[in-house]
């Protein structure tokens, strides 16, 4: 009997690495789809191997940096889109694109279902599922964090770490570093674990893309950004593609300690994060 195919939005992190294995145990032929959205911290080759070790029938990695910046990031910058006046929406912008690519892969591979690793408490479940159904109203959505057999047995990161250890799934997270991260060209964000305590400041080593303003150059650096029809196209006379331009500006800003935000977010479901 052929197994039903399922396309999982795969980041290579703790949650989705465990989900690859768990979904395979439920009888699905898991196709793990990881999109390259410009994440510098993650090793995509390592993610490929990790997905295979976790039990994926296929691990697909697709570079969508240019599409992400051109069609999602730049419009949000033009709109000066900030959630609650602070959050730059880096994660929010990426989810519809990830969903779109999952639906496309499901069509090519003959998959009957798509899956995500979002919990029933956060915003991502809404972003993913509304996007899935908008693109394919007939697709089956598997959300393990809403399935009692999963979330009652593995309610948090401690249990997921134990699961990964039991089945030999290599993950970056640990009991000493229990937080989760999400990175793309728009941002890198950290949440969960110790960060759920609003009195707990982020640790210095968490900031992987920017140095502390205390250690940034004293002298300012002036740059000239050229725009064409509302979109940035060049810096100091040098032309870049949208993704390359944002990559360059991210590196420059990081050197000068620009871009750090610490906030408490109001979630769609009414909780704080």
Label every PLM stretch briefly.
Residues 1-9, 14-273:
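Nucleotide-activated chemistry modules centered on ATP-dependent adenylation/adenylyltransferase
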């Amino acid at each position: 009997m052929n197994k039903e195919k399922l396309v999982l939005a795969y980041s290579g992190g703790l949650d989705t690495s465990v989900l690859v294995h768990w979904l395979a145990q439920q009888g699905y032929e898991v196709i793990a789809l990881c999109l390259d959205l410009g994440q510098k911290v993650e090793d995509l080759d390592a993610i490929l191997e990790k997905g295979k070790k976790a039990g994926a029938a296929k691990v697909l990695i697709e570079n969508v940096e240019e599409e992400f910046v051109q069609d999602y990031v730049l419009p949000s910058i033009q709109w000066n889109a900030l959630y609650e006046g602070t959050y730059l929406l880096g994660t929010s912008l990426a989810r519809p694109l990830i969903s779109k690519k999952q639906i496309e892969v499901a069509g090519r591979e003959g998959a009957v279902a798509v899956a995500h690793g979002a919990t029933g408490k956060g915003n991502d479940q809404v972003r993913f599922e509304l996007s899935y159904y908008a693109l394919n109203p007939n697709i089956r959505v598997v959300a393990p964090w809403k399935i009692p057999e999963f979330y009652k047995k593995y309610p948090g990161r401690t249990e997921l770490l134990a699961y990964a250890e039991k089945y030999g799934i290599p993950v970056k997270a640990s009991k000493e570093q229990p937080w989760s991260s999400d990175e793309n060209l728009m941002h890198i964000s950290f949440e969960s674990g110790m960060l759920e305590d609003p009195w707990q400041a982020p640790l210095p080593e968490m900031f992987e893309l920017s140095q502390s303003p205390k250690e940034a150059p004293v002298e300012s650096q002036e740059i000239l950004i050229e725009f064409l029809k509302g979109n940035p196209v060049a810096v100091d006379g040098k032309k870049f593609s949208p993704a390359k331009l944002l990559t360059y500006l991210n590196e420059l800003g990081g050197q000068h300690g620009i871009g750090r935000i610490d906030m408490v977010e109001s979630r769609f479901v009414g909780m704080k994060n």
